[in-house]
A protein has these predicted regions:
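Short, acidic Gly/Pro/Ser/Thr-rich loop/turn segments
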Residues: 25-27, 86, 117-120, 160-164
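Conserved beta-strand scaffold positions in the cores of enzyme catalytic domains, especially
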Residues: 3, 78, 110-112, 152-156
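A glycine-centered loop/beta-turn motif at secondary-structure junctions
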Residues: 139-175
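N-terminal beta1-alpha1 cap of cysteine-dependent amidohydrolase-like domains
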Residues: 1-47, 163-211
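Pocket-forming structural segment of enzyme catalytic cores
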Residues: 71-145
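Cysteine-nucleophile active-site neighborhood
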Residues: 24-100, 105
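Structural motif
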Residues: 17-21, 53, 156
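Glycine-rich His-Gly loop
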Residues: 20-24, 57, 115, 159
């Protein structure tokens, strides 16, 4: 792990996993300005199958824009997605949520809290389909959350996402190792009974079919 402070340059050629989170508007604006200067390096990393997890504001920033209050701020335009203000209905989308995702044999559970409605372009697939009896996803309309492109995951699910969903953590680790080693890897199984039990409890509580 290499610590990088605000204003310092980042060498992504040695990175195995990149995480983009969200935060208060002021701090997110400062971070996005730095990221704009790294746009092509990040694009090369993503297109080269680098493992990347982007949550909430970090997910929005990967698209053409992100929202800061009523202001639309320039995004990285690495992925074909855009975020718009809410129309009629709820202002913020706040709820526990569960998804069906090709990356996990268990439902992907988490917590969403976002005002923006994110629309995917035709070239992108969602990270998962909303299967809980509550939850909104990308836009409260499509029935899907996030996006999955190469080894890049974008999502509105906080949680913590990886602690609640071991299969997603395993996917990112395996993707990073395979890119580094140039060959398929099989991860050594860890004891994750507690995490899976918590996942199953939330899936049942959220009304996931078959849970």
């Amino acid at each position: 792990v290499e610590a990088v402070h605000y204003g310092e340059s980042v060498d992504l050629t040695s990175a195995d996993i990149v995480f983009l989170g969200g935060g208060p508007d002021r701090e997110q604006k400062l971070a996005s300005e730095v990221l704009l200067g790294m746009r092509e390096e990040l694009r090369t990393y993503v297109e080269g199958d680098g493992a990347l997890l982007a949550i909430c504001g970090g997910y929005q920033i990967l698209g053409s824009n992100w929202l800061m209050g009523d202001e639309s701020v320039e995004g990285l335009s690495i992925l074909d997605l855009k975020t718009v203000r809410a129309g009629a209905g709820f202002d913020r989308l706040i709820e526990n949520i569960a998804l069906e995702s090709e990356l996990s044999p268990q439902p992907v559970v988490g917590y969403e809290n976002h005002a923006g409605r994110t629309k995917l372009g035709a070239s992108l697939n969602p990270f998962g389909k909303v299967v809980s009896n509550v939850g909104h996803g990308n836009d409260d309309d499509s029935g899907c959350d996030g996006t999955l492109y190469r080894n890049c995951i974008g999502t509105y699910l906080h949680g913590p996402l990886l602690g609640k969903n071991p299969a997603i953590a395993d996917h990112l680790i395996a993707a990073a190792m395979e890119r580094r080693l140039g060959s398929k890897v099989e991860l050594v199984a860890l004891e994750d009974e507690v995490e899976l039990a918590a996942n199953a409890y939330m899936a049942k509580r959220l009304g996931v079919p078959g849970a």
